[in-house]
Amino acid sequence: MGKNKLLHPSLVLLLLVLLPTDASVSGKPQYMVLVPSLLHTETTEKGCVLLSYLNETVTVSASLESVRGNRSLFTDLEAENDVLHCVAFAVPKSSSNEEVMFLTVQVKGPTQEFKKRTTVMVKNEDSLVFVQTDKSIYKPGQTVKFRVVSMDENFHPLNELIPLVYIQDPKGNRIAQWQSFQLEGGLKQFSFPLSSEPFQGSYKVVVQKKSGGRTEHPFTVEEFVLPKFEVQVTVPKIITILEEEMNVSVCGLYTYGKPVPGHVTVSICRKYSDASDCHGEDSQAFCEKFSGQLNSHGCFYQQVKTKVFQLKRKEYEMKLHTEAQIQEEGTVVELTGRQSSEITRTITKLSFVKVDSHFRQGIPFFGQVRLVDGKGVPIPNKVIFIRGNEANYYSNATTDEHGLVQFSINTTNVMGTSLTVRVNYKDRSPCYGYQWVSEEHEEAHHTAYLVFSPSKSFVHLEPMSHELPCGHTQTVQAHYILNGGTLLGLKKLSFYYLIMAKGGIVRTGTHGLLVKQEDMKGHFSISIPVKSDIAPVARLLIYAVLPTGDVIGDSAKYDVENCLANKVDLSFSPSQSLPASHAHLRVTAAPQSVCALRAVDQSVLLMKPDAELSASSVYNLLPEKDLTGFPGPLNDQDNEDCINRHNVYINGITYTPVSSTNEKDMYSFLEDMGLKAFTNSKIRKPKMCPQLQQYEMHGPEGLRVGFYESDVMGRGHARLVHVEEPHTETVRKYFPETWIWDLVVVNSAGVAEVGVTVPDTITEWKAGAFCLSEDAGLGISSTASLRAFQPFFVELTMPYSVIRGEAFTLKATVLNYLPKCIRVSVQLEASPAFLAVPVEKEQAPHCICANGRQTVSWAVTPKSLGNVNFTVSAEALESQELCGTEVPSVPEHGRKDTVIKPLLVEPEGLEKETTFNSLLCPSGGEVSEELSLKLPPNVVEESARASVSVLGDILGSAMQNTQNLLQMPYGCGEQNMVLFAPNIYVLDYLNETQQLTPEIKSKAIGYLNTGYQRQLNYKHYDGSYSTFGERYGRNQGNTWLTAFVLKTFAQARAYIFIDEAHITQALIWLSQRQKDNGCFRSSGSLLNNAIKGGVEDEVTLSAYITIALLEIPLTVTHPVVRNALFCLESAWKTAQEGDHGSHVYTKALLAYAFALAGNQDKRKEVLKSLNEEAVKKDNSVHWERPQKPKAPVGHFYEPQAPSAEVEMTSYVLLAYLTAQPAPTSEDLTSATNIVKWITKQQNAQGGFSSTQDTVVALHALSKYGAATFTRTGKAAQVTIQSSGTFSSKFQVDNNNRLLLQQVSLPELPGEYSMKVTGEGCVYLQTSLKYNILPEKEEFPFALGVQTLPQTCDEPKAHTSFQISLSVSYTGSRSASNMAIVDVKMVSGFIPLKPTVKMLERSNHVSRTEVSSNHVLIYLDKVSNQTLSLFFTVLQDVPVRDLKPAIVKVYDYYETDEFAIAEYNAPCSKDLGNA
């Protein structure tokens, strides 16, 4: 505070500079025009004009200037004196979405003229678009229903043209699209049926707007069974480290509102912050477990001592995780609920509730502070201490019953430009420890800065702490203090105020104050009706212009409830109803509103809660929820006169000017509002002349932008099966997950009545509506509920799917909510589709009393595939036999309840997939290809299914699947590169063909960034890379992989940041491995033997590295490249002179290396030699290894080509396409024939069989695609026809060339023809899937699988056993490449992860991975020495009559070398009874 003595004289100096020196200043004309600093095009904007102390008529004009010219916003506006006049204007659309322009305002009269020019930001107005799906999660085969809604920034509907909407699957495929459609009433509905075998995972609906913006909405596709009940876990949200106990409650509630009977198990854990799987549970968490029975209300309560969690220990998370499992009585169905409690060290906390943001010297500074405990509960009757050192203020006060204290600080003697108020309750704990958390009592502190006013006049808006509620009128108090000496004979002073919201001026007003020629002090109120136009944040500015030219003012920010003008209400009548009965849904909204209705089963919301449409989510769509400050380019330069830094001598006192950066002037208040001011009034404080370096603190920069948080469909119409006594028996078979999905229009009275039929599900239906009106805009209803319930019913418990022949237990539970006992008979209707045997020997009628239940079970073995219906009836019987002490009653209505539910039955055996690819180019004519789909003799009956995909781009499938190109695991440094490199080729290709969209670019760059980070995990300290990195004990870098990473990182620099050090280090490391003859030494172990077999090891590796260096690209004159080319040229010369020649693989690499180096002669020589060894068949060309292994016997279809052959053929293709200066027509003809063969080897994802072949082939295909791409307006027609009655047609053009169009083929086995006419090329991919029963055959691996124990004799064998594997290589080579052992789990079992992780301690195991039902084990290689591996599995869900599970071992790089074995659980026959 030592500067205070200097600051005071400086303020006096500033007053001398600004105060008028004679009365002639009185009445000087003042102009002020206020315009938002951000203007939106094609919408109404407002600017406000204030003219004061004028004695003549003036006109006001405004114009906007950009690089393309000037445009007048308004001209010759006549404004009255002392009246705040606001004028509306529109800004034309700009060619760029965001642009800085110059705004010029001119005020002109007979004797007065004022002109000022400043910058504003102009943004094109964009629509607000959201998507609503009927659910957030779907099963395969269900229909996705969704709506696209568009509004303006006032939430009024927009009937805009939407260029594109599409659905994208988890692999990135665009599986459906809708183009160029007009919204009606601001919305449009769509639907899309999912296939029976879709990819499971996260999908999204993408809306592409005309402006180029896009909106995405996610949904999930999974196989699931809806939960029957909710597990509600209640724990304290916060507990402090001092609490000794906590209360936990767990309740089970059915979706129809009744309590769940059953058993609960609760676990409360505090997890270790650095948990480990290797040292048991103690290294992971402190846990407390307990269990018990649910009471009659379905609840369980427990008081838990917190001592076990050691709340003050530091090494553990500051959270308690509570997990509760409820096991339903009878069915043994288990569902889980979770909650967490935050552990806080904060025992008490002080915070300012209301406090002035600035202080004005001489006006008391007000504040209100609240004291709460660690849970936020107010603490009354406690003494708190308040201090404001700059004002010499020290006080204490006692909190009231709400924990509040008010205070007021006299600011008369504050000498500085800031006032800091500190409030505390208790001092910090003196106890500190490295491992311990100490209690904390949080203080509150607030710094307020001085408001600059040379006139010593002020106006101040009272702060408000609460959110302003909709529909109310809020009163704001404005306090003022006026210095009589500045009024200069004025009789009435006008205070003007305006409100800004959503970035624009929305309201204005004036308050007149009669003044006297003396100092005045007082307050007045401003009334603000709270409506949607000022939500979600209102900024209020108040100001007055004094006769001296000084402007006094203040601004305040008020949070406003997210109001919507269209008030929507939704209600069911009745609110509870019987299944299949009639009900009414009543909607009220603004007249003529279009209302979108939705009602879903509460079970769906329990399965996956929705991101519900709400006022908050809609307001989050706004581009500007609040405008404050100026964007960086718009900060104005201060053109006013500055003060020199020389000392001033006045009346014997020397004054030293000091810069008061933090003082708040009127300009700062306007900047807080985001307003640009055109004025000749004094709104700025003086600033120092910039003679020396000075530092200024700028106000907030940038715009505050909010982001989105993220055909009428008929209602389901349930129908009762017609029986003679419809009230006696109910047959329930209609169980939709979405019940209502409708559009309705309310009438002129604002009401719509919708008649509905309640579905058969006994549950609670949750309904919602949003409505759009041209006048009132958007409205959203609160949730309405209808409970579908009947007091006596039967429900079925069964899994999502089962395997044919695998027995499962079907359970039927009869529930009686009648007040009396009933005697019930339960029957399962027989069917040829399954065999059912009662679990209980006797099927006698059961006695069920009030609120009771009875579960009846059958062991069911399905015999048919697909959806199999199960029909179960429960009937209340007339009987005189007592139930307990009473005679059973028979319900008057609904004495028999029948439920019909389907179950998906899947085929047994091992699934096989065969892919047939064709690239057909009609060139104005017609081309066709025959397709014969045959099935092997050992196919599982009814298991075959096939589909055809149609794409207009050769890379279409691959570019949508860059993260899923292989149907294999990605667990090492080389395999990671197949996630990385193809993105570069896709980006290059789309750039060159001008097809690159922002969406694809963004996605590909995202993959490049993550792949780059992941690849650095495999880097060594010396700059090299290896397959599993140093952390797996591979201490030597790998020459081949380092070259691969080097060239790919170098190529990725065009799209993402790559640290040059990684490139330099890898290049240096490689150059150190170059020998004197220019060839490279091999270093590190390669997992792929394809390039290290035979005498030409060194040449092949050297060719690969030379290619990598030239692709960086390094020039041929670079020393390392020059020497490497010498090595290759010498090797080629030797090969030509020798008898044995070169390996085909080596020649393919040499051809491409010479092509890259520009050595056309050598390229032609090698290609000529290769052409002599080419395999030519069916107008296609490829190359094979001379000693190609025999194809395994027993393949029904020719297997996919080996990885090495795809790779070498792709290198030849690259050599043809890299001719200098460009490929000739002969080169392209040869390339086309090669492409025909390569595309036939692609898998369903667009990749190939392994890593290198995928990377090189996609590189080659992208170059071929770019070389042959033509953008034509013509289209190709595709016809797929069977020899029977099936026929399907597609069209492929520029608009849908990247759309994956698909159709299922119904006739299997079958003969099909595929015909293409028109222009362009069409890529057709047929996928045939079927199951087979494994047969004994000769494999190149010996694979043995056993379980320990092998039999069911041991007591633990039901729930746990070991899997023991033995693997060796018996093929034609000395050892395999890297191999993967894939162990599928037996149904109902899961692996024990720590035992799987232990396998990595073996020298032969590089890595392990665990998925939901598979264990993957990576082996460096497999030789003829047997490897033994074992791990433990645990029972997760009981399943009877288990089918065997498959274990597969395969060579990662020669995928046609594999072996299959199967195993079963020791107790496979009777696990269902366990």
Swiss-Prot record:
Signal peptide boundaries: 1-23
GO cellular component: blood microparticle; collagen-containing extracellular matrix; extracellular exosome; extracellular region; extracellular space; platelet alpha granule lumen
Alphabetical list of SMART domains matching this protein: A2M (SM01360), A2M_N_2 (SM01359), A2M_recep (SM01361), Thiol-ester_cl (SM01419)
Pfam families on file: A2M, A2M_BRD, A2M_recep, MG2, MG3, MG4, TED_complement
Chain residue ranges for the region called Bait region: 690-728
Disulphide-bonded residues: 48-86, 251-299, 269-287, 470-563, 595-771, 642-689, 821-849, 847-883, 921-1321, 1079-1127, 1352-1467
Record region (Inhibitory): 704-709, 719-723, 730-735
Crosslink site: Isoglutamyl cysteine thioester (Cys-Gln): 972-975
Localization in the cell: Secreted
Function according to Swiss-Prot or TrEMBL: Is able to inhibit all four classes of proteinases by a unique 'trapping' mechanism. This protein has a peptide stretch, called the 'bait region' which contains specific cleavage sites for different proteinases. When a proteinase cleaves the bait region, a conformational change is induced in the protein which traps the proteinase. The entrapped enzyme remains active against low molecular weight substrates (activity against high molecular weight substrates is greatly reduced).
Protein name in UniProt: Alpha-2-macroglobulin
Species whose genome carries this gene: Homo sapiens
